[in-house]
């Protein structure tokens, strides 16, 4: 291939990137201009996909970590025909398909929403794990590569520690990462903030490390070829690139390697936009153009890819004909449909902690749902994800026949990896840790909600009843924070996250069914450490617990209640005990409502909502979190008993007494409400 046209194509990407930012009067041109050489060679020579079916499941994937470099991605995808020049002109504008940071759109070639730095390449690790999981079950014929692009900022983010460690430990040789090492960031040069040896660090993690001149086409080409031949390690290609490559000032002098070009149009940064466009071989009066020889280069690549895809599809057909049962299973995995599973056959132990009830369900999943991966951040025997692990095995370097990821202590990394697994497709992703450590995971949870990924979060040790570990490990404000995600809508108008806090073992089974059936948003399951008494049932507790699918339902009824008691989780059982006193001492008519999900409840019709929580009946709420957690259900005229401070270190039954989570206090508080 002519290096002249290769360089012209990279310059075309630089021109389009700079022009997009200039026209929008907003954006980040410098990094995009420096990284253009790598993406150009990757997309014209190495990245395999089907141009006629961009979502073909066995395609190579490209994950962009630094979302601010979106002009580079949009430009290279435009050269391949996935965006129009008009799309590029509308960069960062209302209603455009080219937002400031890429938002997942695989039909156009955007594999991930690029969020805070570090998450993109960690999602790529997840996608690479997903590929190995599927290959272990269906064969190497479907093997494909995951490429990712990271910047200096992404390398500095703490999440890169977990991603680098795990990818190396698992020997993900299907993962190739280009590190755009231009030594410039927004406010400083990198040597002002770090002196680490990145190559040595990744080598210590077990990566194949290649260092090249990152704007040299031949060097890039050679490095990718070397990475493709690597059999046992992920590869990082450290490309020493030039920020703002090609930028010049009004007098024509060099304006490369300037911090100012990181996050503003070239004109504002101190460069001359028109002189830069001319310097790169473009027309300053018409920068939004694709050079004819570059268009031809990409057209030839598209033609080659279509021929390649036809061959791969033929290989798949041959394999499917020879393996009809496996082929049917693979189709079912890739469909994204809810797996068939009989939840009524799950036998729960009476009075179990909901984390233990979850373990029972997970054990059944390990045997009955073959396309599920579960992970834990070094807490599998405490968050009870070991219910799943005990019926499969953990991934090991070279062996992905199991279905459990031992992530180690890295909650954010784990959550972001789950996002990558979900983005890849074909697999149900779930991960667990203590609820208090959800603080570490929220950036990835937010990304899952934004991307509408059905990741399942298993959060145990849900309240102050963690006990002796004390306030550092006792969630108080966490449920209120998380339930705000039920109020936040995604771009399809749905609640961005499904939050479920089941009240007993049978409700936990139902909660898991709701989680598995939710294929359009993340689901959070908030589970107890301590045992919980089973809620009363007229006939069959499991059958009655199915009403949890409506978000809130009555577990104890009376014809004309004087008061309605509302809670979720273990507090519901406490309300049952308090109701006994209210009935025995005062003859009060009491209704008790279990409300595992306010978000689901508010999706029901008004008639149902009024039937469960009629406006004209006084309501009392009990929560082990902040009172605001229940305010939407209890209303402004009701009363809520909750916590207003951090917890304390003591046995949980002592804390129940000291903090007022007793039948006697419930009785007293309800009497005060009705006085």
Regions found by a protein language model. Give the residues of each.
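Active-site flanking residues adjacent to catalytic metal/cofactor-binding acidic residues
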Residues: 151, 179-180, 239, 377, ...
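Residue-level marker for buried hydrophobic side chains located in beta-strands
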Residues: 148-149, 177, 375, 620
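Catalytic metal-binding/acid-base residues of hydrolase active sites
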Residues: 154, 242, 380
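DG-centered beta-turn motif at the end of beta-strands
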Residues: 126, 144-157
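Conserved beta-strand elements of the Class I
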Residues: 147, 373, 564-566
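N-terminal hydrophobic/helix-forming segments and targeting peptides
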Residues: 272-278, 293-297, 303
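Thiamine diphosphate
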Residues: 1-145, 295-526, 530-533, 594, ...
């Amino acid at each position: 291939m002519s290096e002249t046209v290769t360089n012209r194509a990279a310059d075309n990407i630089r021109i389009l990137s700079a022009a997009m930012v200039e026209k929008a009067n907003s954006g980040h041109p410098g990094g995009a201009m420096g990284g253009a050489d790598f993406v150009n060679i990757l997309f014209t020579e190495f990245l395999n996909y089907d141009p006629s079916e961009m979502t073909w499941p066995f395609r190579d994937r490209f994950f962009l970590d630094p979302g601010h470099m979106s002009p580079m991605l949009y430009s290279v995808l435009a050269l391949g025909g996935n965006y129009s020049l008009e799309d590029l002109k509308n960069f960062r504008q209302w209603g455009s398909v080219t937002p400031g940071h890429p938002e997942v759109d695989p039909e156009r070639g955007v594999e991930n929403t690029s969020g805070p730095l570090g998450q993109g390449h960690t999602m790529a690790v997840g996608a690479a794990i997903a590929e190995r999981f599927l290959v272990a079950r269906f064969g190497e014929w479907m093997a494909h590569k995951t490429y990712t692009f990271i910047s200096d900022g992404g390398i500095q983010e703490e999440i890169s520690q977990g991603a680098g460690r795990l990818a190396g430990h698992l020997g993900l040789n299907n993962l190739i990462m280009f590190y755009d090492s231009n030594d410039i960031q927004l406010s400083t040069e990198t040597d002002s903030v770090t002196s680490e040896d990145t190559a040595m660090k990744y080598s210590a993690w077990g990566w194949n490390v290649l260092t090249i001149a990152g704007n040299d086409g031949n060097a890039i080409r050679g490095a990718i070829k070397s990475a493709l031949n690597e059999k046992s390690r992920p590869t990082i290609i450290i490309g020493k690139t030039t920020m703002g490559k090609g930028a010049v000032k009004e007098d024509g002098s060099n304006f490369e390697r300037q911090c100012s070009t990181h996050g503003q149009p070239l004109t504002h940064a101190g460069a001359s936009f028109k002189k830069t466009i001319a310097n790169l071989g473009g027309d300053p009066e018409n920068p939004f153009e694709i050079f004819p020889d570059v268009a031809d280069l990409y057209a030839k690549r598209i033609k080659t890819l279509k021929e390649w895809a036809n061959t791969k599809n033929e290989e798949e057909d041959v394999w499917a004909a020879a393996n009809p049962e496996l082929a049917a299973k693979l189709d079912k995995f890739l469909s994204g449909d809810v797996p068939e599973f009989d939840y009524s056959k799950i036998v729960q132990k009476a009075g179990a902690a909901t984390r233990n009830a979850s373990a029972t369900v997970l054990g059944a999943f390990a045997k009955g749902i073959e396309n599920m991966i579960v992970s834990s951040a070094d807490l599998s025997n405490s968050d009870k994800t070991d219910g799943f692990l005990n019926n499969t095995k953990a991934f090991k370097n070279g062996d992905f026949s199991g279905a459990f990821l031992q992530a180690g202590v890295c909650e954010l990394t784990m959550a972001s990896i789950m996002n990558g697994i979900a983005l890849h497709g074909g697999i149900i992703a779930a991960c667990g840790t203590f609820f208090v450590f959800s603080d570490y995971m929220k950036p990835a949870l937010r990304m899952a909600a934004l991307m509408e990924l059905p990741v399942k979060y298993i959060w145990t040790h849900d309240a102050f009843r963690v006990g002796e570990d004390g306030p550092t490990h006792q969630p108080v404000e966490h449920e209120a924070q998380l339930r705000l995600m039920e109020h936040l809508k995604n771009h399809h108008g749905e609640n961005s996250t499904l939050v479920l806090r089941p009240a007993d073992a049978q409700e936990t089974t139902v909660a898991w069914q709701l989680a598995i059936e939710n294929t359009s948003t993340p689901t959070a399951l908030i589970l107890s450490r301590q045992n919980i008494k089973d809620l009363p049932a007229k006939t069959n507790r499991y059958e009655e617990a199915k009403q949890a699918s409506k978000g809130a339902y009555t577990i104890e009824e009376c014809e004309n209640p004087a008061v309605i008691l509302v809670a979720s989780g273990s507090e519901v059982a406490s309300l049952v005990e308090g109701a006994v006193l209210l009935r025995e001492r005062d003859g009060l008519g009491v209704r008790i409502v279990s409300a595992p999900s306010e978000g689901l409840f508010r999706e029901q019709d008004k008639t149902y909502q009024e039937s469960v929580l009629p406006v004209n009946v006084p309501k009392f709420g009990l929560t082990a979190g902040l009172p605001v957690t229940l305010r939407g259900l209890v209303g402004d005229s009701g009363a809520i008993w909750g916590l207003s401070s951090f917890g304390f270190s003591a046995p949980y039954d002592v804390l129940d007494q000291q903090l007022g989570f007793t039948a006697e206090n419930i009785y007293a508080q309800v009497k005060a409400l009705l006085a």
